């Protein structure tokens, strides 16, 4: 139990990134020099919920500010929190755990909470670290709020859905928290806590930009992707009006003129997407440009024209592979011909397109990799693909890989 006379303070941390030797060899000294970087929107959502309920919150964005672990620890010491929440993807789990150990050196009484995609699947392993008090699984807003209130009041931890913790030598895995059905009930992300202006997009041309999450979940089942296993395969949407309220807030209060929708797939529902596009004009957001992820075979000329009128400037497509056997093996659910048709119609309407490609899927050969490279070239030369990015297939926790 925490002294009830004391203001409850929580510090949320996006931990330092580790720059690879390859990136360093090309002159990169921090993550913002490597690729497009976004503010930690998930932490900002949690912060918004905590602040709405009277908890004092600060947010440390170590990766984009170029902070070391020592820098982060100094800021945490200055804040003097009772709780520290650290987000972790698989690529930064070691950084997060190292930071957790350092936090406990400040004071063993600080409760350390870890969450994020890696924790969702590996919570029973991560909780065995002595420096980690709680693992939060799934959507973190309500779970973190309930957990902090429970610890503060000395309540029963087994009543908090979505957490894993240690009781002596035993690991306690509470039931999963059901997904929140009405996403409009969440507070907007606490963007006032962001350390501007460290963020940039591939298409912003120096403009301030902000990410937005308007939906959660993905109805598809790509074998390399953990998103449907974290957010569910049901596509949950905020109301159009709620999304427009947030867009208007960041447009007028923060001066943002470029939005990057971070939804796994924004355009699942055609009517909802068209209503959103038309609503932007009705709200007077005439010079607000934006980008989103699309899906091959899901867009139509009608939808793309509405998106173009609403100032959509680029759509990111997960094309992945140029070989039909590999596409089928990873359960993408579309054909090479559909790829060409989708890129062609996007270009014809006047929206730029970016293709995500991968290499190294199980059973791939030199020939299938060449198929992918050749498809990317063909799309650029003959169908209007504007840009492409290539990555190596990685078997992340929670995926069939």
Language-model features and meaning:
Residues 14, 59-66, 87, 229, ...:
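Residue-level recognition of beta-strand->loop/alpha-helix junctions
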Residues 125-128, 303, 363-378:
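Catalytic cores of alpha/beta
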Residues 19-23, 168, 220, 270-271, ...:
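Flexible glycine/acidic-rich beta-alpha junction loops that bind and position SAM and/or redox cofactors
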Residues 42-182, 398:
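Glycine-rich beta-alpha loop elements in corrinoid/cobalamin-binding modules
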Residues 38, 188-356, 361, 371-374:
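Radical SAM [4Fe-4S] cluster-binding motif and immediate context
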Residues 10, 56-58, 112, 290, ...:
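Hydrophobic anchor at the start of a short beta-strand
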Residues 28-47:
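Short catalytic helix/loop segments, enriched in acidic residues and glycine
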Residues 2-6, 16-26, 30, 160, ...:
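N-terminal [4Fe-4S]-dependent radical SAM core
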């Amino acid at each position: 139990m925490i002294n009830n006379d004391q203001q409850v303070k929580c510090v949320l941390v996006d931990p330092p990134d580790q720059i690879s030797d390859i990136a360093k060899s090309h002159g990169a000294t921090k993550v913002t020099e490597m690729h497009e970087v976004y503010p930690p929107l998930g932490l900002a959502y949690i912060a918004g919920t905590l602040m709405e309920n009277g908890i004092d919150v600060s947010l440390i964005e170590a990766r984009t500010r170029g902070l070391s672990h020592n820098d982060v620890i100094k800021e945490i010491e200055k804040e003097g929190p009772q709780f520290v929440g650290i987000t972790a993807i698989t690529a930064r789990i070691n950084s997060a755990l190292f930071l957790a150990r350092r936090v406990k050196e400040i004071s063993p009484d600080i409760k350390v909470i870890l969450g994020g995609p890696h924790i969702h699947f590996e919570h029973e392993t991560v909780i065995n670290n002595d420096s980690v008090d709680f693992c939060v699984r799934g959507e973190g807003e309500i779970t973190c709020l309930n957990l902090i209130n429970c610890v503060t009041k000395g309540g029963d931890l087994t009543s908090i859905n979505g957490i894993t913790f240690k009781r002596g030598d035993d690991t306690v895995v509470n039931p999963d928290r059901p997904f929140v059905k009405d996403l409009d009930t969440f507070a907007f992300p606490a963007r006032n806590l962001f350390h501007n202006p460290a963020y940039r997009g591939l298409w912003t041309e120096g403009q301030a930009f902000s990410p937005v999450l308007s939906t959660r979940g993905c109805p598809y089942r790509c074998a390399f992707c953990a998103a449907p296993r974290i957010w569910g395969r049901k596509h949950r949407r905020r109301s159009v009006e709620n999304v427009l309220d947030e867009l208007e807030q960041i447009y007028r209060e923060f001066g943002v003129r470029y939005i990057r929708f971070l939804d796994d797939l924004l355009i699942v529902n055609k009517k909802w997407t068209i209503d959103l596009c038309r609503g932007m004009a009705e709200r007077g957001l005439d010079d607000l440009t934006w980008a989103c992820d699309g899906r091959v075979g899901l867009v139509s000329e009608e939808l793309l024209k509405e998106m173009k009128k609403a100032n959509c400037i680029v759509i990111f497509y997960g094309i992945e592979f140029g070989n039909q056997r590999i596409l089928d093996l990873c359960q993408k659910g579309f054909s090479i011909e559909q790829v060409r048709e989708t890129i062609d119609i996007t270009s014809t309407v006047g929206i730029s397109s970016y293709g995500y490609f991968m290499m190294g899927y199980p059973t791939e050969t030199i020939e299938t990799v060449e198929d992918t490279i050749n498809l990317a070239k063909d799309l650029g030369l003959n169908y209007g693909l504007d840009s492409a990015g290539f990555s190596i297939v990685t078997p992340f926790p929670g995926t069939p890989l």
